[in-house]
Amino acid sequence: MEVNILAFIATALFILVPTAFLLIIYVKTVSQNN
């Protein structure tokens, strides 16, 4: 099974970008509550 580096990067970005965005919102919300 060959690993397509471009597909791997695209998948990583597709997962990491929304996750990072949600984490930033979560951190801001917690900071405001405190």
UniProtKB/Swiss-Prot annotation:
Highest taxon in the source lineage: Eukaryota
Predominant localisation class: plastid
Membrane spanning residue stretches: 5-25
Subunit structure: PSII is composed of 1 copy each of membrane proteins PsbA, PsbB, PsbC, PsbD, PsbE, PsbF, PsbH, PsbI, PsbJ, PsbK, PsbL, PsbM, PsbT, PsbX, PsbY, PsbZ, Psb30/Ycf12, at least 3 peripheral proteins of the oxygen-evolving complex and a large number of cofactors. It forms dimeric complexes.
Bilayer topology: Single-pass membrane protein
Cellular component, GO, one term: chloroplast thylakoid membrane
Entry protein name: Photosystem II reaction center protein M
Localization terms from the record: Plastid, Chloroplast thylakoid membrane
Organism for this UniProt entry: Coffea arabica
Family the entry assigns: Belongs to the PsbM family.
Primary role: One of the components of the core complex of photosystem II (PSII). PSII is a light-driven water:plastoquinone oxidoreductase that uses light energy to abstract electrons from H(2)O, generating O(2) and a proton gradient subsequently used for ATP formation. It consists of a core antenna complex that captures photons, and an electron transfer chain that converts photonic excitation into a charge separation. This subunit is found at the monomer-monomer interface.
Keywords, in A-Z order: Chloroplast, Membrane, Photosynthesis, Photosystem II, Plastid, Reaction center, Thylakoid, Transmembrane, Transmembrane helix
PANTHER family named in the record: PHOTOSYSTEM II REACTION CENTER PROTEIN M
InterPro entries: PSII_PsbM (IPR007826), PSII_PsbM_sf (IPR037269)
GO biological process: photosynthesis, light reaction
